[in-house]
Regions:
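Extended beta-strand/beta-hairpin segments
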Residues: 1-64, 72-99
Length: 99
């Protein structure tokens, strides 16, 4: 078993917590020292101007993390079988439904 941790940091940048104006931008900080700029997924429920332009949203991160795990598993199997892989590319697609 392994343990994985991250730190999530958000700071209020508006005077009030008005649902129409508070910033959704935050940071994911990892033990490796990497910091990722994150925010909400832009969409009809999120007011314009509250989401950073150069950010990753949690939903995209889940899709990328699952695809990354799949790739690492594939590469490990290939290496154990003595296969040489020169390039790997994936275009994962995730769908979240409200039911």
């Amino acid at each position: 078993m392994s343990t994985h941790t991250a730190r999530l940091v958000w700071n209020r940048t508006t005077e009030t917590m008005d649902p129409k104006t508070y910033a959704r931008d935050h940071q994911w900080r990892f033990d490796s020292g990497v910091t990722v700029a994150a925010s909400a997924a832009a969409g009809p429920a999120i007011p314009p101007g509250t989401v950073g332009a150069d950010t990753v949203d949690p939903e995209e991160a889940v899709v990328a993390a699952l695809a990354g795990c799949h790739m690492l598993f594939f590469l490990a199997l290939a290496a154990k079988k003595g296969l040489t892989i020169d390039r790997y590319e994936d275009a994962p697609h995730g769908v979240l439904e409200n039911k």
